[in-house]
Each structure stands twice: as C-alpha cells, then as structure tokens.
Design a protein with these regions (language model features):
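A helix-coil-helix interface module used to build multimeric assemblies
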Residues: 1-152
Length: 152
C-alpha cells in the first residue's frame, strides 16, 4: 500500500503482524476444536494458547531457507511453544490457513469501508440539506442546462 493514500486502519489489517496473528488464531481455534473432539490433548491447547507467539523478522528469516511462508510461520511458533507445537496444523493444509485468513482480512476491510461509506453518506445528506436552496448551473450532456440546486 502507498502510505500517503492509505488509511492507518486499513494498513493495519494487511500488515504482516496482523496476518500472522490471524494465522495463530486460526491454528489455535483448530487445536481447540480438535481437543474438544479428543483428537489432541487439552494440555497441548493450553500451552499453545499461553506460549503461542511469533516474530515477523524471524519468520522472514526462516522463509528464506524453507521457501514456504506457512512452514516458516509454524517453525517460528514452535520455537515459542515447544513440544506441544507438534499438534499445531495437524490435519490442515496451508490453504486452510491462508484462505481463512484472507476471509478474515476481507471482512475487516469491508467493515472499515462500510463504516466510511456510512460517514460519507451522512456528510452528503448534511450538505444536501444545507445547500437545498443554493442555485447552480445545471448540466446535460456536458453543456450548460437549466439552473438547479446543489442540494435536494
């Protein structure tokens, strides 16, 4: 994103830190579900929840070796979690994480855009009411036409 054209709230949604946090949340939720089904031990989920962390620079470093973003992420998380990390990503594919993350990011971005549209529409309504009697030159097919008003 080009900083001068980007809203900080939108940039935050797409930053690597946010992406990897969503990945960690997805992996943790998957482990929680597997623990509820008795597939993995509940203690492992507790450890993953408590110790689960990552460092973007370290993930980038690992990815230079592995040439795989998800493997790099999982390797870095395992450095924090330890032995229970073997249950992370069990039964999942990279697409499970990437596609779910993208859906979360798109939902957050859409919510931000819709909130902005609501503010824009409110401002337009205010201006339309404010200028309902302000006369201006009408236009039709790119040329001057009958007078109209800026507002409603």
């Amino acid at each position: 994103m080009i900083p001068r054209y980007s809203r900080p709230e939108m940039v935050a949604i797409w930053e690597p830190e946010s992406k990897f946090q969503i990945w960690l949340d997805i992996e943790t939720y998957a482990c929680e579900a597997q623990a509820e089904l008795g597939v993995i031990p509940a203690e492992a989920v507790d450890a993953i929840r408590e110790k689960g962390a990552f460092e973007v620079a370290r993930i980038d470093e690992i990815e230079l070796e592995t040439k795989h973003d998800v493997i790099a992420f999982l390797t870095n998380v395992a450095e924090y979690v330890g032995e229970p990390a073997r249950f992370i990503h069990q039964g999942m594919t990279s697409s499970d994480v990437l596609d779910t993350c993208l859906s979360v990011q798109l939902t957050r971005a859409t919510d931000l855009l819709l909130a902005g549209m609501d503010r824009l529409l409110a401002a337009l309504k205010t201006r339309a009411e404010e200028h309902k009697m302000t006369v201006c030159m009408g236009r039709s097919h790119g040329i001057h036409a009958e007078p109209t008003t800026f507002g409603v």
